């Protein structure tokens, strides 16, 4: 491959969005893309296209005095920034260095200490609760404790300075945790809801701690829905105080103590999210108001007005009239991770990487891009990947990086949530957006930003695999329902715009982890995140008629859940989540080959067919399968892609492969001798 000088000059730009932010978000990257042969031989060429997606991704924010503290997301190392509102500059930061994201921030009543709780992919045996002394911001935050629940999702500090934490770990019901700053001890106070899978909200008064849980992740299979418990600090006992109207929602999402009231919100699923205001003196006395959003979070208050964020923007709730109203804002706020009401103004922190200072009375706002203000713009872990002859796309949090394959220019596009998987058809990008965002699209010839193409039932919230069916001109998307269990197959016609959601096409427990297509038939690979029930079922499905054609149960050694599927000729290739490999002859509907590839593929994987060869990628290795013997060969060893939610590989129309090596996007041109 011959490189031009333009390929050596890579620029990272922020695409002009609804807020008109189009300034450079990072320094020039002058290192040229490198092509080199690998151990697989001279027929394999790897081109480094630079960082997949660079931004200051964030997951939490809290205003203390005149400074907003912001927790990072999927960046290494984890850190908290201090954004000074009067100067609109990042004036300090502290590196925590543990985990991948910071979702929980809370300040003690004096405003001196900021507590931060982290999320981890695996228990590192290190503190997951940190404290930063804001009087000496030049000194780093220190780890002060570790809960046995791996992830901390929310923190609250009682008036006496005692810290309470909630969160969870897969396979275990969440507990309420207490950190005593006087003794330095972390204590488990109990598990109030043994059927909950995650706790996301906590609030505390002098006498009571409120614990909000449910099953935002890992729903179904008997998991509980939204639950609210009051913990008596003196007696050490829990009491269920969940408003009955909220019990259908999958989870309590947020809690706020305002004077003598407790404000409670939920995440919605089959119904919209709800907001309740409860009397602290008599928790059976409350007002409850449905919203139009899928989630209500980031509760804050000014006098009798409660402000909150939903998936559609900002809203206010009047305690006097019990009326919810939108808060005017000229632009797209995206996914909101911080909201504070101070002095009649709102401070909004968006997942798009900006801080907005908003006057709710007039709708006027001042918006500051965090990259321009001094936040580090660095590579984050990646999600879906797609490419054509001109552009390659890498999904991230609240953004998609567009790589110009001719010039090397990289532009960050705005898209709320997460682009879990994507495809490019005739130059147009199509994505499956988590959570409950449906399908989005972007046409570079038309410019602008990505926009929603089609919505689907909100409970079918997690798209996992996007596939194109050229026979029926359909986009096929395999989906998981985090809250209800099971999943669905979405279809969208690129010709007519018609859409459909086929709920639980495998069974009531299995989600659709993978989708492949041949001759107008969709092949669905099942997976089951629960401990019970079948997993790994393969279903042949007519996506036009919306009906099953036949199904196949895999051999017992392969029933660990499907990770990926691909079709070559009459053969359906499949990988399981523990490295099991199988080939199905679609003409006789039978497994004709199996193998154990745990050595190179110990967990999640992705596959794609390119130039008549099926390729796969794991967390560690890019590999191919021989089309006649099905033997596995390594293409790129130790590729070690930095993925947020499982590896991806895709191909452009010329058959070149795109995946991640570390946090960099790479193009792999492989011409094996078959």
Task: For each feature predicted by the language model, list its residue ranges.
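A short helix->beta-strand "capping" segment at the edge of beta-propeller domains
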Residues: 38-54
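Blade-level signature of beta-propeller repeat domains, shared across WD40, Kelch, NHL, RCC1
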Residues: 643-674
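Residue-level signature of beta-propeller blades and closely related beta-rich strand-turn architectures
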Residues: 74, 120, 169-170, 214-217, ...
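N-terminal secretory signal peptides
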Residues: 1-7, 15-34
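Structural motif
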Residues: 77-81, 124-130, 172-177, 219-227, ...
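Repeated scaffold domains used in trafficking and secretory/extracellular systems
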Residues: 55-60, 99-106, 149-156, 196-203, ...
């Amino acid at each position: 491959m011959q490189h031009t000088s333009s390929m050596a000059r890579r620029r990272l730009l922020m695409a002009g969005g609804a807020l008109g932010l189009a300034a450079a978000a990072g320094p020039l990257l002058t290192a040229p893309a490198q092509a080199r042969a690998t151990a697989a031989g001279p027929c394999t060429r790897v081109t480094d296209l630079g960082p997949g997606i660079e931004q200051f991704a964030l997951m939490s924010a809290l205003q203390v005095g005149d400074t907003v503290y912001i927790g990072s997301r999927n960046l290494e190392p984890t850190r908290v920034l201090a954004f000074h509102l009067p100067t609109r500059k990042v004036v300090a930061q502290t590196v925590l260095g543990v985990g991948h994201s910071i979702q929980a921030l809370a300040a003690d009543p004096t405003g001196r200490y900021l507590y931060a709780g982290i999320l981890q992919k695996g228990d590192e045996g290190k503190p997951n609760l940190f404290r930063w002394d804001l009087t000496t911001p030049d000194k780093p935050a220190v780890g002060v404790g570790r809960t046995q629940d791996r992830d901390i999702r929310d923190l609250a500090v009682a008036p006496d300075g005692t810290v309470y934490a909630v969160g969870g770990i897969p396979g275990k019901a969440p507990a309420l945790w207490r950190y005593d700053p006087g003794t330095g001890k972390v204590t488990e106070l109990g598990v109030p809801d043994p059927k909950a899978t995650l706790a996301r909200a906590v609030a505390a008064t002098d006498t009571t701690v409120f614990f909000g849980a449910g099953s935002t992740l890992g729903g179904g299979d008997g998991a509980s829905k939204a639950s609210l418990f009051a913990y008596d600090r003196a007696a050490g006992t829990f009491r269920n105080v969940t408003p009955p109207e909220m019990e259908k929602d999958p989870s309590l999402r947020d809690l706020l103590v305002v004077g003598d009231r407790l404000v409670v919100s939920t995440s919605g699923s089959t119904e919209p999210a709800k907001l309740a205001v409860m009397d602290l003196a008599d928790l059976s006395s409350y007002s409850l108001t449905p919203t139009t959003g899928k989630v209500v979070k980031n509760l804050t208050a000014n006098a009798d007005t409660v402000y909150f964020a939903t998936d559609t923007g900002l809203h206010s709730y009047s305690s006097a009239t019990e009326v919810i109203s939108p808060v005017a804002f000229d632009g797209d706020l995206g996914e909101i991770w911080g909201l504070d009401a101070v002095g009649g103004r709102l401070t909004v922190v968006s997942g798009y990487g900006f801080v907005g200072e908003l006057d709710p009375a007039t709708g006027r706002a001042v918006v500051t891009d965090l990259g321009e203000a001094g936040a580090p713009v660095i590579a984050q872990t990646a999600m879906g990947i797609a490419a054509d002859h001109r552009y390659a796309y890498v999904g991230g949090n609240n953004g998609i990086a567009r790589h110009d394959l001719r010039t090397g220019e990289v532009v960050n596009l705005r898209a709320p949530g997460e682009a879990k998987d994507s495809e490019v058809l005739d130059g147009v990008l199509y994505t499956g957006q988590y959570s409950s965002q449906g399908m989005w699209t972007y046409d570079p010839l038309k410019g602008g930003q990505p926009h929603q193409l089609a919505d689907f039932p909100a409970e079918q919230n997690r798209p996992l695999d996007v596939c194109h069916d050229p026979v029926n001109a359909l986009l096929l998307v395999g989906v998981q329902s985090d809250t209800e269990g099971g999943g669905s197959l979405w279809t969208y016609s690129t010709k007519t715009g018609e859409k459909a959601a086929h709920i639980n096409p495998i069974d009531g427990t299995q989600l659709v982890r993978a989708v492949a297509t041949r001759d107008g038939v969709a092949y669905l690979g099942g997976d089951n995140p629960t401990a019970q029930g079948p997993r790994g079922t393969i279903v042949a499905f007519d996506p036009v008629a919306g009906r099953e054609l036949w199904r196949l149960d895999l051999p017992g050694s392969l029933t660990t859940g499907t990770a990926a599927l691909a079709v070559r000729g009459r053969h359906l290739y499949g990988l399981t989540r523990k490295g099991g490999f199988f080939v199905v002859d679609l003409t006789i509907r039978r497994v004709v080959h199996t193998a154990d590839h745990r050595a190179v593929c110990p967990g999640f994987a992705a596959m794609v067919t390119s130039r008549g060869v099926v390729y796969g990628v794991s967390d560690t290795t890019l590999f191919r399968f021989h089309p006649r013997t099905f033997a596995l060969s390594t293409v790129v060893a130790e590729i070690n892609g930095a993925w947020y939610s499982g590896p991806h590989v895709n191909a452009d129309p010329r058959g070149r492969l795109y995946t991640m090596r570390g946090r960099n996007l790479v193009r792999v041109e492989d011409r094996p001798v078959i």
